[in-house]
Curated annotation (Swiss-Prot):
This is 2-succinyl-5-enolpyruvyl-6-hydroxy-3-cyclohexene-1-carboxylate synthase. Homodimer. The gene is menD. It catalyses: isochorismate + 2-oxoglutarate + H(+) = 5-enolpyruvoyl-6-hydroxy-2-succinyl-cyclohex-3-ene-1-carboxylate + CO2. It comes from Haemophilus influenzae (strain PittGG). Belongs to the TPP enzyme family. MenD subfamily. Its EC number is 2.2.1.9.
Amino acid sequence: MSVSVFNRCWSKVILETLVRQGVSHVCIAPGSRSTPLTLEAVRLQNAGSVTCHTHFDERGLGFFALGIAKATQSPVAIIVTSGTATANLYPAIIEARQTGVNLFVLTADRPPELWECGANQAILQQNMFGQYPVANVNLPKPNADYSAQWLISLLEQAAFQQKQQGGVVHINVPFAEPLYDATDEEVNSHSWLQPLQRWLIQKKSWINVEVQQNEVLMHENWDHWRTKRGVVVVGQLPAEQAMGINSWASAMGWVLLTDIQSGVVPTTPYEDIWLANQTVREKLLQADIVIQFGARFISKRINQFLQAFKGEFWLVEQSGKALDPYHHSLTRFNAKVHHWLRAHPPLRQKPWLLEPLALSKFCATFIEQQVGGNLTEASLALRLPTLLPYNGVLFLGNSLLVRLVDALTQLPESYPVYTNRGASGIDGLLATAAGIGIGSNKPVVAVIGDTSTLYDLNSFALFKNVTQPTLIFVINNNGGAIFDMLPVDEQVKDQFYRLPHNGDFSQIAAMFDLKYAHPYTWADLNSVVKQAYSRRKATLIEIKTNPSDGSSLYKRLIEQISHAVIGA
């Protein structure tokens, strides 16, 4: 039996199985040991079953796949060769695990006889990602003693675990040489595949899983709790689940606190600012019940409120993950938000607390005055909605800007917002944004800090394949301005936290053949944005600001609102 032919047969079954689990995008890094998998992915692309994407940097490739999976809400497969190529996927795997994004990670490996004996590019790859995958599938070297049916069943069991929990399936695939000599005809006619001929034609899963839909029932004490003083807190949610929360909370007369990732239009915007007001926060803590939809809040003030609240606490979240870092004694509903709302009709009543609305209105005027008309981090955050396309998506990086956007921006209802807030790292943000653009096939506005951009420069190469207008805002405040919030000596802060780079991104844009603009005023920016939307390609828009402007304004707003006396 030809080793190269059987390597391809083995790979054919793996890839065909993943396609039947919903994979339509395969992200591939170049490498020799992964050749059997790569060639089968190419065959599937030629057959119209998948789209293949390539990138030379495995770390960026992992986040690119993450972005596609976020946008399509379908699993994405990644193929890499053996050695440290596999380790570079770890950050994206961590983020996927934290946020329940489905990835199939296929790591080609040296065969077992080459492990731990000094062979080139052979590292210990089995279970190398620890507890982060929902399933680790450590395959043997391709061997006809294992039936094709066994291989499919093993992979589908892992895929079932993924559907239940959300996250990463790691499939480690050792291959012996030779890797290159097989033809498609030799593979397709191999006797090992004969029992699968009907399966290969029908395109159905090997194991049919009947999913039981659990109906959401009204809580037995809902008629009691809906008469009480309540606060609704909304974190990161899929866009389709945001509808109806605002009107439901308004009908109840309850206070609504929303995260920018929620897609919910706030009734009392600027929560991150006005929650700094001690008088209002103390009154809010007198609520009888808090109902939290979603999780992973950006706002420090919302998190502080959740931590301080000691009353009845309900959490509505469909993933089943533990998403209460403050360890409330709570009632949990594993349900989609709109299903839960339908099962818990509101009781129409007047607002029980008027101060948040009054303070929110005061903030609107006060913030406008403080931000002013110059092109700065804060003004970009405040007026970001004027720059967004009607049918587009927004990606926010992990920097000072995401906090300013969360504090100051009011987006249209259910406007798609993507973030990497699972581990909240600054790695892979450009790559994730590129993947979201490819996966959504919509115009993208990405807003990313300068340090984050420097950390992921290689991923600018991924934007050459976008087919929709893509605006990459790089906020250049000369380093990590987010660290201005720390109570650290200024000299120490510069040397060990902010790390000023004193550069710009014009030559970087040229290197990656990106359109580049550096507007100085809002008039300049509006002109640049108009031109960028006329092109079905990426434009890098660099906004240079003074290092401390954004952080100083943010601290000033919080400080002044904290002492404001507002009549309800």
